């Protein structure tokens, strides 16, 4: 059985494929600390949603998401995260949308300097597919973990 795992670095994503030996990466980016001069004027993500669209290389039938708050000194509180097949631009196919859970809960808090991985979720992901990841934040750090090339 093929599996996929998506690692999400605060606003950046990594997708991983599972084999009998373990998980294998299919999309990746590196987490970075933010440089204040590169942040938008208002970077407050509290009570906002962010959608990141990634193009995976391999597909599978299971997905997980890993979120990182490794470079922040404040916790991140996430109300929910859902994934869906991305259509044109940032539109999604609503029939494909599925919510992720963390320890069987939709809401998750990521402590400062830590990462967390979602529960495995059955999901039909095709090779080279565009996947939309939508994160609904309750509160987020003023200086987040980012990837400077991803201005989402």
Model-flagged regions — what are they?
Residues 1-23:
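Bacterial Sec-dependent N-terminal signal peptides
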Residues 19-152:
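N-terminal secretory targeting modules
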